[in-house]
Amino acid sequence: MKTFTAKPETVKRDWYVVDAEGKTLGRLATELARRLRGKHKAEYTPHVDTGDYLIVLNADKVAVTGNKRNDKIYYHYTGHVGGIKQATFEEMIARRPERVIEIAVKGMLPKGPLGRAMFRKLKVYAGTEHNHAAQQPQVLDI
């Protein structure tokens, strides 16, 4: 019997909606990354993108444990000399709440073209509204 290998053109991708309200950031991100990679499917193949599309709602209401709300710091570099910027978790949630979940999930995906393709299937929104109703997403309880 030959080993099964998924082909990119035969992969069936579903759309799911996930509510992030009250969920712990890291635990949510690991499950999202797992589903973006397709590891929950029997036909998972490491070199083929077999994952599903995920819509995350209420990103502004995601939870963190301990003192991370004030102590966790996000850094980014502007490209200029002395241009390293930092923001706490609280500031990131106030300014761009979607980015917090995106950063957490992106770090858990493979680095390279395949990882970037997987990351493009993640859609994160701060509120409860999204513009993917035409895809008829199913509710996913994580």
From Swiss-Prot:
Any idea which UniProt keywords this protein has? Ribonucleoprotein, Ribosomal protein
Q: Where is the signal peptide?
A: none
Q: Which Gene3D superfamilies match?
A: Ribosomal protein L13
Q: Name one GO cellular component term.
A: cytosolic large ribosomal subunit
Domain of life of the source: Bacteria
Q: Tell me the GO BP annotations in alphabetical order.
A: negative regulation of translation; translation
InterPro entries in UniProt: Ribosomal_uL13, Ribosomal_uL13_bac-type, Ribosomal_uL13_CS, Ribosomal_uL13_sf
Q: Which PROSITE patterns match?
A: RIBOSOMAL_L13 (PS00783)
GO MF terms held by the record: mRNA binding; structural constituent of ribosome
Please state which protein family the record places this protein in: Belongs to the universal ribosomal protein uL13 family.
What binding partners and quaternary form does the record give? Part of the 50S ribosomal subunit.
Q: What does this protein do?
A: This protein is one of the early assembly proteins of the 50S ribosomal subunit, although it is not seen to bind rRNA by itself. It is important during the early stages of 50S assembly.
Q: What is this protein called?
A: Large ribosomal subunit protein uL13
Q: Which organism is it from?
A: Sodalis glossinidius (strain morsitans)
